[in-house]
Amino acid sequence: MPLTFANVGEENMIKKVGGKPETRKFLENLGFVAGGTVTVVSTIGGNVIVKVKESRVAVSKEMAAKIMV
């Protein structure tokens, strides 16, 4: 399921990062890699705030929809 459907506070394993090659590279540089874990902290406006690799990152809902957990 896309990261946008994950419950707040629930740790999820990243299964796949989709999108264009440059989008995948950008997300991988932020720590979104297959096999890694991600936790949705909150959703504010059009952004999803997540915890990945001990950092909090805000990504747009469009980008979050490309991350499968």
Residue spans for each PLM region:
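Compact, glycine-rich, soluble single-domain proteins
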Residues: 1-69
